[in-house]
Amino acid sequence: MSDTVRVYEIAEEAGASSQDVIAKAKDLGIELKSPQTAVSYEDAEEITKYMMTGKSERLATKPAKVKKVVKKEEVKKETEEIETPKEKIETVQKVEKEIIKKPELKKVEISKPISKAPQKSEEESENLENPNKIVPKRKGLVIIKKKRPKEEELEEQQTITENQSKKQMKSLSEILGGVDDEEKSYNEPKNKENDDIKKQKVKKEKKKPLIKTQDHGKKLDVDREYSDEFASSDDSLLGEEIVLLDMDLSDSYKIFDEPKPQNIVNQSRSSKPAAFGNVPQGLKRGKRKKRIVRTQEKAEITSVTIPEDIRVYEFAEACGKSPAEVITVLFSLGMMVTKNDFLKQDELEILGEEFGIEVTVKDALEDVNYVETYNDEEDIDTSSFVTRPPVVTIMGHVDHGKTSLLDKIRSSKVAAGEAGGITQHITSYTVTKNGQEITFVDTPGHAAFSAMRARGANVTDIIIIVVAADDGVKMQTEEVISHAKASGCPIIVAMNKMDKETANPDMVKAQMAEKGLTPIDWGGDIEFIGVSARTGDGIEDLLENILLQAEILELKADPTAKAKATVIEASLEKGRGPVANVIVQNGTLKIGDNIVCDTTFGRVKAITDDNGKPVKELGLSQTGTVLGLNEVPTTGSVLVAMDTEKEVREIATTRAEHARAKELSKSTKVSLEEMSGLIAEGKIKQLPVIIKADVGGSLEAIKGSLEKIANDEVKVKVVHAAVGGITESDLVLAGASGECIILGFNVRPTGSVKAKAKADGVTINTYSIIYDLIDDVKHALSGMMSAVIREENTGQAEVRDTFVVPKVGTVAGCLVTDGKVIRGGHARIIRDGVVTYTGKISSLKRFKDDVKEVANGYECGIMFDKFNDIKVGDFIETFIQIEEKVSVDD
């Protein structure tokens, strides 16, 4: 760093312009030419001190500049004349002390002569006549008159009474408030000495030119807040502005405004260090601050509780890991996933072991598990318990007489109303026997209704397995036995069709014993009862056994509790809306109850019993239909009554959102081994279908059956499946899906829908028997499959000689040894047991004539398509290709 300072840097530090610094330096005897002139540190400090305080050691030792020589004895007199009250306002304490000590005096320069009084005193006249008197040079005081007083105003001021002119004037220091005692004691004798002197301005004979100085002080308007008395005096400063240059009223009496404090942070960023003192020197580029990164030590995660359905990134957040770490671990195990894929239970366990974290899986629907809440919160009051009727489910193979047996018990003809004579809906009825009610649930026996049968087994107390005595145990019978054993309910075997001559009850007992159901008379615990749905034989014994089993079970429930029921079937009926067929398991279901059923909710609007009659309530184990739900409920779901509509709405909405998110977010992750399978699956032909059914149970059965119809080449793609009639929106969806077929089960399209379907080219097929629907879909899939090409050998020939025909090719002279050779047929050339060529016969001749075929034992000439490498001893095998269609079942 250099030992000099520039003038402009001194000006910045002193808060003045460079010209002021040059002028002040000239007073101190330092010659400066321009703001870029370099000054030593000592001179710079002296100039700054002089500009700030008005004092300097060099100024004290400097010889006084006196323009005119005057007599010494007149100095004191001139000083007294200058010390007027006006000057006391405009001077400062330290300057007055310097006058007493007779320092070097500077001339006071007045901008304009003031003539306030027409008559002048003798002393003033003498002063004007002797302009060579020494006038002390005052530093930093210039009085600038803003307005020249008019003659009328001067005359008015002259008429002011002498008493007013003698009033004590306030000094500038007193006005500014802050004059110390020393200054007051010094001013008091001066005031007394000057009481007789008129308060007038000191004038000069000639008007001196005003020295132009840089205005680096603050203008002070002294007439702002003072009394009228002061404003009306002769020496008032009204209409004038005083420019105070470098005044020093000591450090505590500075008139100029204090500079605003600068932001230290901003100053440090935008200015470079000062040459001296603490004043910024100039702009500089601030250094880039280092960002302080506060690292918080994260607590190590040892265990997490996560929902059942969780994505990769959600699991990573819960474990405090990045998704990349989780994906890397799964990739090392041969699993290709993205951060949006769902994780399975075994994958969560593997990740937990890999990261050393205990993973606990929580059911996302646990908080809205209304069934569990109902079972836990329901007060058990045994005093309110009553015996409830048993719920009996009839199950068995198709066409074994289940519905006919139930019709005989109810004395009705339900089976006659079923399409094709087979049950395709799950139904329930209540029968009274000896004053006791029994609720029967009839299930379909077809293979497609496996889920229906399982649902019937879950809501029942007693299961009756119907087996035809002449037919024995069949496929669906074995399935029914499995459902019955899984339910843990008592089982009764009804051997139907005992009126037939071919009935063989012992065969049925033996077959059932092989399946684990041993009759009582064979030493087992299963009751076998022979019945006939046609004649009614054995039905009374069957009902008595049912009541006996119910008595042993001691079935009881609380009819005063809130209702709990199971939906065994659901549908959407025109004019009624969503309808649920339910069996009450506990409590009493009444009209007006707020109910929730899985993802649906509502208020019970109407109830009908099993005969279709409207009732106000359903009691224990009674069956009926309920209206009032907002949507068609899921078959097999539990219906519960609650206190408020808000409660049921929140539960249903939450469960619906979860179900929808789960459906839309099916995982797309595959293993590395499955990649080739996916590539091959892209070649599989699909048959898109839309399924509409009358009830939810049938819809479920049809959808499950169609999805099972698939092989390596074709499969069924269910675009949409719903309960209800065929609407125009289904046609729009079918058109958008491309070559989509609409399948209706027990539903019919209206005339307008048919017309629109014909115009749009959409195929609608309706069925009333599930067999027909499945068979038609199989035929459609079979038509989509490629035909199988089968080869059939037609003959064989041996090459005896070869002939080369120019520009034609090689002709093989052959002898037909087996069958016949056909022109245009396929042929293989076999040489030493190896097939060297497979192609077509382009030309066949016998002697010189073209022939269509040559039989066994005859010679012929054969040419092949684009092949001439024929040798003697080759064998020619001819064959034809036959295309054969295949079915899905094959």
Curated annotation (Swiss-Prot):
Molecular-function GO terms, alphabetical: GTP binding; GTPase activity; translation initiation factor activity
Swiss-Prot/TrEMBL keywords: Cytoplasm, GTP-binding, Initiation factor, Nucleotide-binding, Protein biosynthesis
Binding site for GTP: 396-403, 442-446, 496-499
Residue ranges with Basic residues bias: 135-148, 200-210
Compartmental location: Cytoplasm
Signal peptide annotation: none
Compositionally biased tracts (Basic and acidic residues): 184-199
Gene Ontology cellular-component annotations: cytosol
Chain residue ranges for the region called G5: 532-534
Coiled-coil residue windows: none
Ranges where the record places region G4: 496-499
Region of interest (G2), ranges: 421-425
Main location: cytoplasm
Every tr-type G domain range: 387-554
Protein family according to the UniProt entry: Belongs to the TRAFAC class translation factor GTPase superfamily. Classic translation factor GTPase family. IF-2 subfamily.
Reported function: One of the essential components for the initiation of protein synthesis. Protects formylmethionyl-tRNA from spontaneous hydrolysis and promotes its binding to the 30S ribosomal subunits. Also involved in the hydrolysis of GTP during the formation of the 70S ribosomal complex.
Name of this protein: Translation initiation factor IF-2
